[in-house]
Amino acid sequence: MKLKKFTRRRFILASLFTSLLVATDARYIEPNWVKTRRLRLSNNPSHRFVQFSDLHYKGDRAHAKSVINRINSLSPDFVCFTGDIIEEAKFLPEALEILSGIKTPMYGIPGNHDYWSKAPFDDIFKCFTATGGAFLEDDQRIIAGGKVNLMGVAHLGPNHPLPAPKPEMKNILLIHYPAWAKEFNQKFDLLLAGHSHGGQVRIPFYGPVIVPFLVDEYDLGLFQTKAGPLYVNPGIGWFPYPIRFNCRPEITVIEI
């Protein structure tokens, strides 16, 4: 009987200790513990660039600047941002000031929070253009010496023609919502998305506890879709709660 009581006590203490460790990690460690993931999609890649997503800037200047410094240290050919700079328009000026520190052409698309915040998009366009890139709200650019066709889709519907891949180029499509990959009949060399945050909390051997709308099965990582390979970045920031578990913020270095 004593052994049973002792074992139960140890189990309770171990459970409490484990819960404390998980809570500490999820609240104070992982949200700021940015990792760099490398994704090689070709045996002989000719382009090396960075994707990051879902900054959700809320005034956390030091964290955001450390992300930009990390991106610059990687010396990519160009940078792709897949939506959600902010949640509130009041944070946009400071967020754009920080983003303007990127030292290579930056291309991006809006996310749902960028629209919901009613932020002045003219300022966003100017910021991205100043880096040598562009904000691709249903737009596209031929970049990398005419070798890459970079497209951004912000809306779907009859009033918004879908971009056309170009032959003999690498065709890369930026979308915010991963589930939109199901809507394209064209074939792309790569689709990039954000929005999901990877679920923010991922249970080992199970996956995300919850994901937002328009994610479906494309919650995190590389997927094969009818439109081509889709990579879903887990983002930098968080919403609505400042927690991450088993789902660190990520800067993705892609070779294609």
Regions from the PLM with identified roles:
Residues 204-216:
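Short, surface-exposed loop/helix-turn segments at secondary-structure junctions
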Residues 43-51:
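Membrane-cytosol interface motif
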Residues 50-126, 130-134:
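Membrane-embedded segments
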Residues 46, 76, 103-104, 167-168, ...:
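Active-site acidic short loop of glycosyltransferases
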